[in-house]
Amino acid sequence: MRIRILSSYTGPAFATALPTIPVYIYLPTLYGVHLDLGLTITGIVLLIARLIDTLTDPLIGLLSDKFAFRNNHRKPWIIAGALIAGIGIHQLLNPNPDAGIVYLLSWSITLYVGWTMFAVPYLAWGAELSSDYHERTRITSYRECISILGILAAGALIAGATFMGWSEPKSI
């Protein structure tokens, strides 16, 4: 596989890995401590959103396989999912001071549905790029390495922002 195609496919893995640290590590603190929901309630709300996510994963997989678009049949799902997830993460990381349980739950579900709409077709697309087993392994390995670089970059950005004196909520 040409490096240009491999780079085009693996590039989004970097961008989609960037929000993982803010969402998984700082989101509970943001809502549980800074917005006074309490860590237990915040954890329960996020668990409920994840349980709903377990239902949407196979549904989105089925729909993205069944309703294929002509050329690049997975790209509309990927683009729509990225937009929905982007809106969800923006709302989650920029809550109103009076944001409560319903706000956290609804925007968490929005994020996870968007993420599923992005991730399931994106991962399936990688498997469709080659019929050769070893080439698919190479494609997946490159994608996951780029994803890890995105996670490390997110951690470095937040650490750098904190080092420069920004508070934790401003860092995320």
Protein language model regions, located:
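Membrane-embedded alpha-helical bundles of multi-pass transporters/translocases
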Residues: 1-172
